Amino acid sequence: MNEIILLKLGELVLKGLNRRTFEDRLVANARRRLQAHGKFKVYTKQSTMYVEPQSEDCDLDGAWEAMTKLFGVVGLSRARACAKDKDAMLQTAVEYLGDRLAAAKTFKVESKRADKSFPMTSIQLSQYVGGELDEKYPNLTVDVHHPELTVYLEVRDYAAYVHADPEPGAGGLPVGVGGRAVSLLSGGIDSPVASWMIAKRGIALEMVHFFSYPYTSEEAKQKVLTLAKLLTPWCGRLTVHVVPFTAIQEELRRKCPEELFTVLMRRFMMRIAEAVAQRCGAGAIVTGECLGQVASQTMEAMRATTAVTTLPILRPVVGMDKEEIVRIARKINTFETSILPYEDCCTAVSYTHLTLPTICSV
């Protein structure tokens, strides 16, 4: 039988009566990600999602890469389906995992019977297949605690599946089950990470970027669009709302005290973000603010900017160290783009900030 991808569902299996809604969203998200890689059959059964190629020209490697970035999945494996027979599973293990079995020094076999009508217990099946493999491959020694290779046998309703060590999935919840938010994407390290973290909790995103030409360059805008593209494999399709911001900044420079410039600018950003949110049906605003990281990100400054909107402000990186944020940025492949030397509107036009602004002062 053909090679397929098995995906283990995450916390969505605990959603009770809402579980079907979560699973349907996950399947829809998977199908959209797979469109570029060929025709696949995608369905869920028994806490597992199956991705089955429907033609020889399907790009299974590309499909695998896409599924590693699918929120809602905690583990995934490339597997070979076979008949629900102990000898068929043994033969499939030899054919499908033979090279890895020949290269390993220690191994074990783990079996799972979702189909309880199968005539052997899970332990009996593991002992049978493990014993036969141990005899066939003299290089192998059984190690049930710390094996170099684990062979998994899954007996399900319509077929059995053989695979080796699964890889971790993206975790989280399917994008879209938690509603919609607008995320302020500046071009720095923090805002893409904040967007990724919120998408991981099932929130669909629309991005807002404030563009201050000629103080910021076309390259700076392109950098932000590139960051959005890098987030797309995780977050799904993203719309970037590019907001001309030069006139507001110039007016603030003329009329407001220098020490209040940054906090007033951010209050305008929140008002505009709220207007965008209302137009696209979003229920929250996401920022990459990190408490104490810069002078404009104190608790008092955050309170002053939050006061102008009735929407909740989600700050997923607010309590993280910079090293933690950078580690995630490297993982999601946004770091190298974020550090390109193009200024955003906050750094290109700025003054010394008041670190403890009050609501009355602004």
Feature locations, PLM:
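Active-site adenylate/phosphate-handling loop in enzymes that bind or generate adenylated species
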Residues: 128-133, 139, 166-178, 245, ...
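Small/polar glycine-rich anion-binding or flexible loop at a beta-alpha turn
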Residues: 293, 341-349
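Single conserved hydrophobic/aromatic residue that forms the stacking wall/gate
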Residues: 353-362
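A conserved beta-strand->alpha-helix junction
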Residues: 228-254, 344
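A short alpha-helix-loop-beta-strand transition element characteristic
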Residues: 333-341
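Generic beta-strand/beta-sheet core signal
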Residues: 10, 163-165, 208-210, 243-246, ...
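Conserved G/P- and acidic residue-centered "switch" motifs that form tight phosphate/ATP-binding loops
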Residues: 188
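RNA-binding accessory domains that recognize and position tRNA/RNA substrates
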Residues: 1-182, 192-238
